Each structure stands twice: as structure tokens, then as C-alpha cells.
Amino acid sequence: MDKKSSHPAGAARDILIELRNAGVYRDGRWLVRNVDLSVERGEIVTLIGPNGAGKSTAAKMALHILKPDEGMVSHKPGLRIGYVPQKINIDRTLPLSVERLMTLTGPLPRKEIDAALEAVGIAHLAKAETAHLSGGEFQRALMARALARKPDIMVLDEPVQGVDFSGEAALYELIARLRDDTGCGVLLISHDLHLVMAATDRVICLNGHVCCSGTPRDVTSSPEYVRLFGSRAVGPLAVYEHHHDHTHLPDGRVLYADGTTADPIAGSTMGPRGHCHVEDGHHHDHEHHHHEGGQPRA
């Protein structure tokens, strides 16, 4: 998937969220400090770091949930935020359909629910119980709930947690496509140092402070990153690169770069144009190539 430029030459920067020298102090220590971070319209920024690095604290500052004890946080006036939390407290033993999940935070017109579910590829699951969804399907439902409110920016906290590698790849493709289709900004938070989506415009590596930032390849080759995580962290770090001209939807259809969709050949894992069929949580290896440590992995 070709990455769109977040701010073409000569274009005015449309900053949605900005943190400047922001920090949070609690119980005699700084949870995070000196955080400089911004997300522009149409830009994907990925915040990575180990557990306890302050990623969630930084995200809460960005969302105005936490007030910084130093520095500042600013939002574009009238900013609409679509938030997909790391965890959502839902009793999975109680009946709750996907379409009902969509309205837990407020009513939505039926057409908006249908459009959002279609956009994330799970329109066929509108009546399904959330307890019966796979990890990838549930994440898509949460993204649809955020997307339905037409956000200027989506903040995704560990959106691929609990999803296997093929499911992660499908969700990363979806995130990039939603950015391309809507023009929204995306702030993605992840603890996984070994998988960064190639569609990311910038990566910010956090460990109590910003230790390095830049493109995925810039970050993994920076001396600060190597000092923090060790030379062994560089080799296995996988920068996910997907060179297909299509995205696989959970219902089996194939969405192509030109916006058309097609059904897979009955009884086959190959789509009508000869492409393999990837579902959230399952992956059949038909010449998919991922790059890990600079070496292709078939």
C-alpha cells in the first residue's frame, strides 16, 4: 500500500493534537517527561516503547484525560476524537450484539452504524453477539464505533493486542485504509517493538521520555534506540511491509486499491484475481512476504 504524504510541500500543516515538553508527576516521580508529540490530519504516528514506558500516560495527556504537570497539550478547536481503548469492560456473558455495542456511548442513526460496519469489513456481523467474535473482529467493531462519529483523529491504544500475526497484518492494513479514505489523523500506541506498520509516517519511541523519533527505519537505526533496547533489538525488529494491491475483509471479500470488491472463488483460499485469502486470526501462506531484520520471510 502506497503511503500518502501527510503534508505535501507547500501545504499548511493542519495539527490536530500537539504536546510540548509535557510531563506527568505522581507519587514523587515523573511517570513521563519532556514529551514532544504532534499528529497532523492524514498522518499516522505510532508511539512505541516497553511496558511501563509511559505510553498510556502520554495518550491520556493527548486525550485531555490527564492534565500535564509541566508543558502543554493543545487540540485543534472543535476536534472530534475517535478513541479505541486498550481494554473495554464488557461482561462477555451478557447478550450484546455488535450493533448494540455501537450505541453504548450514545445513539447513532442506522445508516451511520451500517456505513461504519461496512467500512471495517464486518457489516455481516451486525447482529452477532460480541462474545462470539474473534479478537480481530472485536477490534474492528471497536474501530467502527469510533469511526461512526466521524472523528478528525483516531487514537488506538494497542489495537492488535490479542490478535495473531495475520490478524495484526489485516488490522494494520485497515487502519491505513481508513486514514486514506477519511483523511483523519491516527495516533497508534503499541508496546510491540518488533512490529511496526509500514504505513506509519512517524514513530516515536518512548521510555519515560522521547528517546528517538522518525520513520520506522530511522528509529531502528538510531543510536538512542540501540542504547535503550540493545543491539539485539535491531536485528529481529520487523518493519511490516505489505505489497499487495488489495485488502482482505473478514467476510471473505477482497477489497482492491481502486475501491472495487470481489468474492473469493468458492471452496478456495484464492480470490478471483489469484490473490490469497487472509482472515483475522488465520493466514494461508501464498507468497506473502514480510521483512524481518531486512530479510524477506515467506
Curated annotation (Swiss-Prot):
Top-level taxon of the source organism: Bacteria
Membrane topology per record: Peripheral membrane protein
Catalytic activity: Zn(2+)(out) + ATP(in) + H2O(in) = Zn(2+)(in) + ADP(in) + phosphate(in) + H(+)(in)
Key words of the record: ATP-binding, Cell inner membrane, Cell membrane, Ion transport, Membrane, Nucleotide-binding, Translocase, Transport, Zinc, Zinc transport
Source organism of this protein record: Brucella abortus (strain 2308)
Stated name of the protein: Zinc import ATP-binding protein ZnuC
Domain ABC transporter as annotated: residue spans: 17-232
Cited SMART domains: AAA (SM00382)
Start and end residues of each stretch annotated as Disordered: 273-298
Annotated family: Belongs to the ABC transporter superfamily. Zinc importer (TC 3.A.1.15.5) family.
GO MF annotation terms: ABC-type zinc transporter activity; ATP binding; ATP hydrolysis activity
E.C. numbers: 7.2.2.20
Assembly and interaction partners: The complex is composed of two ATP-binding proteins (ZnuC), two transmembrane proteins (ZnuB) and a solute-binding protein (ZnuA).
UniProt GO cellular component terms: plasma membrane
Reported function: Part of the ABC transporter complex ZnuABC involved in zinc import. Responsible for energy coupling to the transport system.
UniProt subcellular location: Cell inner membrane
UniProt-listed InterPro entries: AAA+_ATPase (IPR003593), ABC_transporter-like_ATP-bd (IPR003439), ABC_transporter-like_CS (IPR017871), Metal_Ion_Import_ABC (IPR050153), P-loop_NTPase (IPR027417)
Enzyme class: translocase
Main location: membrane
Sequence ranges of Basic and acidic residues compositional bias: 276-298
